[in-house]
Amino acid sequence: MRFTLISLVAAFAAIAPFSAAQALDEVTVALAIPPAVHDGAPYAAAQELGFFKQENLEVKTIVFQGAGALLPQVASKRVTFGYPTSEPVISSYFNGKDTLPLRYFYNGVPTNTMEFAVLADSPIKTIADLKGKQIGVGALTWGTIPGGRAALRTAGLTPGKDVEYVAVGALASGFQALKSGRIDALNFNSSWDDMLEMSGTKIRRIAYPEVFSETAGNGFITHTDNFRDHPDLLVRFARAYTKAQIACQTNPKYCVQAFWRANPQAKPAGTDPDRALADATTLLSRRLDRVLNKADGTPRTPGRYDLKAIQAGIQAMADAGEYPSADVPVNNIFSNDLISQINDFDAEAVRQQARSAK
């Protein structure tokens, strides 16, 4: 399965509206950022190992420029699922208009992976030190920006006054902006910062305040109608995805190679192939460890939302002035209703299949 970045205009032409004739088999997943090996490998593994086929699914992915561009596509049923961060959806409850008819059904990133990163020799060592600086993000439509602004406010900074967000593009273009001094810091996820370090650039990471650590990150979201009309489709897709994550945790080297086979342009060129494979394997393993295990190393229930932690994170966002209040119907936004069905499979059989995959 190849990932393609296309314009909104092309997306409108390429994606048929969600319909009953397609719903049982064809799934289009809208992503907010281009996939890299750490988050794209499970899709490739699900394809190669037959997990999508076992669930009678044909899965396609499309990349939009941030959650702000992605969410309207899910709300209008132009795509089946989206994989955005949660802040824009929560924010929609405060805009004085009708809330988006969307609901999350699978927690893809149950721990906050966002952070600030500066060059290792930078004098910036704390969030407060970012005063008067420029922070790079992929696009100003990114759904992660509200969380970053809240982190800045907890340190006494006012975004737009004391510190400025600058669009620098994703991955390599953002890395270059930091290395060249165009910006002072990046506000990327930890896996992207891992990639920057592995490329030879020494950085210093600055974590968000602890209260934001277990807030919901990216997850699979769909139109609320699909909970009523097509719950089995949601279960089958998420089950295949979960199998792929477990397979990649078991055999990350295979999953890296599967991702490169599906996306040859993503394979590093001009570098030692063994080193590139080792680095990518480490990157994927780190990501899956954060997603599938808690901080103490115990396993999470794949896809499950910690609603109490999410509510605490919303309260922290409200306290920081990012939300006008914490009065949000968390249960209407995040659902655990399908999690037991999603995880109803033989995980050890998946691991055995993964161990022999090449």
Tell what function each PLM region has:
Residues 55, 101-102, 256-258, 326-327:
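Short, hydrophobic secondary-structure boundary micro-motifs
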